[in-house]
Design a protein with these regions (language model features):
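Walker A/P-loop-proximal flanking segment of P-loop NTPase domains
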Residues: 1-71
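P-loop NTPase nucleotide-binding core
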Residues: 41-42, 47-183, 189, 195, ...
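Sensor-1/coupling segment of RecA-like P-loop NTPase cores
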Residues: 173-182, 188-194, 201-230, 242
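Short amphipathic alpha-helical interaction segments
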Residues: 371-392
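Short, amphipathic alpha-helical interaction segments positioned at domain boundaries
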Residues: 319-321, 409-442
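Catalytic cores of nucleic-acid endonucleases
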Residues: 498-500, 508-514, 518-580, 584-585
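Winged-helix-like regulatory helical subdomains adjacent to P-loop NTPase cores
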Residues: 285-376
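Conserved small helical "lid"/interfacial subdomain of P-loop NTPases
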Residues: 241-269, 276, 287
Length: 596
């Protein structure tokens, strides 16, 4: 479609900063295009909050809108809709849903993106439709859409929301066209403000081969357990999962963000920041922006800790998570008890190996009694935790009927700060002082920054090289190396048995395991002792994981001593120098190791 516009729904993240979501962008773009051949199934995108799910949907919709010819019989009409958080009645919802669909459908076929961008509605939308009648290819459907609008808006047809939900499929079926519905904030359909059924009326719509529905939202527990995982929509969706960024891409984002916001971060600290933020792009950007506001270059770990402490207690992270937590708590009746339970859940440091992070409800009960002077029953605490789990603030393992803390270190740190302020009533100044003092005394999480940089590059080579043959010369091996399809690739991993030292990179496919070590040593070659350490780690992995095949790979910046080369050859250990690592990275389209 020829236009100077680049979007019909504005992305939230600038191109200069947007990083590493190509897999998901291509996945949904191609899935939408395949719908024209009737080979696409409705799909749900799972992932923690602030991972970029909404941004992916917006960018795919924009791309579909502008990169297709609407005159092509196989063109796919993209439609984006986000379920609002506020209260709606059935007629208001039905009108919003239908008019949103009309804007995209008519706008696409008549090459009028302004219909969507300007959010034209009501009588004005109908007037624009009539004036565009000659541009629209399906005259019969054009009139039918107007009649449906009249039924919903003027005649207030009973169950008008059910009609609105079915219309996209009806249109695609009658015209034999293809429509791709991108539905955001789907969990809102389960909230109290929607006092009418949504999900039950979507069953027929999402089964359509002509109109697949791609859905996501910000409360994964509701999506997976209540909407997609049971009831009328069970079994009707495929699943795609978005995970935190690898630290290779997290470091890349940190550098891009620093350039964009005129902040400063070193190569080594970009990787450290990603590590501390758990690869969450929102947290990474927040710390970068806060460092610019404070005029503090991120050149060492202590400064990152200090800036993170500021942002957790009064900055971008505080603002986002405080809004998220308080909005969810307002939906629960006894807010005072709920706040106590949530705060205490973040403090529980249970390190039991079998059920790590399990919350002890008895401890929560005793602490509330101590501070509030009343006994809250275990059942009431249990019920509150179930409600909190629906907002992804704790994790509920439903089959075992137990709870554990969420796997989000930054959110847990925030809850500790939030609880001091909102539950215990401490002044924000005191909280900020205590937190910054605590963070300034934290020990270094990473002691060899250069070695860690090499580790995250090794990990990314494994990710990007999956199912590919890599030249043997770069591994000093007799045959080319075919990388498997990995299930996981971990950095800095200890075996549960506790045997052996921390493994720099541990990766596993179905039956193949890789044990990797990084030695960024400049000016001298690596000797046999390092290989013996690597062999000890591999032996421990063999004992615990019992792989069918085990590979060892060492990064040695300046190479090996002659005796170490012999040892590596005899024990079939792969190894790569700085030059060979750079060639691997370049071969896979990745940024080479930085010059430090």
């Amino acid at each position: 479609m020829k236009t100077t516009n680049k979007w019909v729904i504005k992305p939230d993240i600038s191109e200069e900063v947007y990083t590493d979501r190509e897999h998901h962008l291509n996945y949904f773009y191609q899935a939408a295009l395949r719908a024209a051949t009737r080979r696409t199934t409705s799909t749900v995108l799972f992932g923690q909050r602030r991972m970029g799910k909404t941004e992916i949907f917006k960018r795919v919709v924009n791309r579909l809108f502008f990169e297709q010819d609407p005159k092509d019989p196989k063109a796919v009409v993209p439609v984006y809709y986000s379920f609002p958080d506020g209260p709606l009645d059935t007629n208001t919802f039905a009108k919003q849903y239908l008019e949103n669909f009309i804007r995209y459908y008519i706008g696409f076929y008549t090459s009028q993106p302004n219909l969507i961008a300007d959010k034209i509605e009501g009588d004005e939308l109908l007037e624009v439709m009539e004036s565009s009648r000659s541009l629209f290819p399906f005259t019969r459907m054009f009139d039918r859409i107007i009649r449906w609008h009249d039924a919903i808006v003027r005649r207030k047809e009973p169950l008008c929301h059910a009609l609105a939900l079915e219309i996209p499929r009806k249109v695609s079926d009658v015209d034999d066209t293809t429509i791709a519905m991108f539905i955001d904030e789907f969990q809102n359909t389960r909230l109290p403000q929607y006092n009418f059924e949504i999900v039950g009326f979507m069953q027929n719509a999402v089964e359509s081969p002509t109109c697949p529905h791609f859905v996501t939202g910000s409360a994964m527990s509701i999506l997976s357990k209540e909407l997609i995982g049971r009831g009328s929509l069970y079994g009707r969706f495929m699943a795609e999962t978005i995970k935190p960024m690898t630290h290779f891409w997290g470091a890349c984002l940190a550098r891009k963000s620093a350039d964009f916001y005129n902040a400063t971060i070193s190569e080594e600290m970009a990787a450290v920041l990603s590590h501390k933020c758990g690869g969450n792009p929102f947290y990474i950007n927040a710390v970068i922006k806060q460092s610019q506001l404070l005029q503090k270059p991120l050149l060492d770990e202590a400064t990152i800790n200090d800036v993170l402490a500021v942002d957790l207690s009064s900055g971008f992270i505080w603002g986002e998570l405080n809004d998220q937590v308080n909005r969810w708590i307002t939906r629960i009746n006894d807010q005072n008890i709920t706040k106590w339970v949530l705060y205490l859940s973040a403090l529980d440091e249970n390190t039991n190996q079998e059920r790590r992070g399990e919350l002890k409800l008895e401890n929560i009960q005793k602490t509330i009694e101590h501070h509030e002077g009343k006994v809250v029953s275990i059942k009431e605490i249990f019920d509150v935790l179930v409600k909190l789990s629906r907002g992804d603030l704790v994790e509920y393992l439903e089959m075992g009927r137990w709870f554990r803390r969420v796997d989000d270190p930054i959110l847990l740190e925030f809850l500790k700060v939030w609880g001091q302020f909102d539950v215990k009533g401490k002044s924000i100044d005191t909280i900020q002082y205590d937190l910054r003092k605590k963070y300034q005394t934290l020990s270094r999480q990473i002691h060899n920054y250069k070695g860690y940089l090499a580790e995250i590059h090794m990990s990314q080579i494994l990710w990007n090289g999956q199912r590919k043959k890599l030249p043997k010369e770069w591994f000093h091996h007799e045959e080319d190396i075919l990388l498997p399809d990995f299930i996981f690739i971990y950095n800095r991993r200890r075996l549960s048995s506790g045997k052996g030292k921390e493994i720099d990179v541990l990766a596993a496919s179905g039956g193949e395991v890789w044990v990797c070590q990084s030695k960024w040593v400049v000016g001298s070659k690596i000797g046999i002792d390092v290989f013996k350490q690597l062999q000890d780690q591999a032996d421990a992995v063999n004992t615990e994981m019992e792989p069918i095949k085990l590979r060892m790979w060492l990064f040695a910046h300046d190479g090996l001593t002659q005796s170490a080369e012999t040892y590596a050859r005899e024990h079939q250990i792969l190894w790569s120098t700085r030059s060979e690592m750079d060639q691997l990275l370049d071969h896979l389209g990745l940024r080479q190791l930085p010059d430090i």
